[in-house]
Amino acid sequence: MLVLTRKLKEAIQIGDDIEITVLVIQGDQVKLGINAPKHVEIHRKEIYLAIQAENNAASFASKTSLERLTEQLKHLKGGKQA
């Protein structure tokens, strides 16, 4: 992990397109401003992890639904009703 120290109003550049600036320091909180292209998704880590968990759950539900549908189609193709 790269560790950098920045003061108020100082910035960090990531590649050509992303700039992170320290906007406010209040006690134990730091407010950051992030300039990045619109196609770059930026989330707080806890939000990112929640999105990943929801996507994984949706993927599993979709797989289960697809498996059920496949079984029903097999029964119908064989002349049997599910």
From Swiss-Prot:
Transmembrane segments: none annotated. Disulfide bonds: none annotated. InterPro entries: CsrA, CsrA_sf. One of its GO terms (cellular component) is cytosol. The keyword Repressor applies. Its main location: cytoplasm. Homodimer; the beta-strands of each monomer intercalate to form a hydrophobic core, while the alpha-helices form wings that extend away from the core. This is Translational regulator CsrA. The gene is csrA.
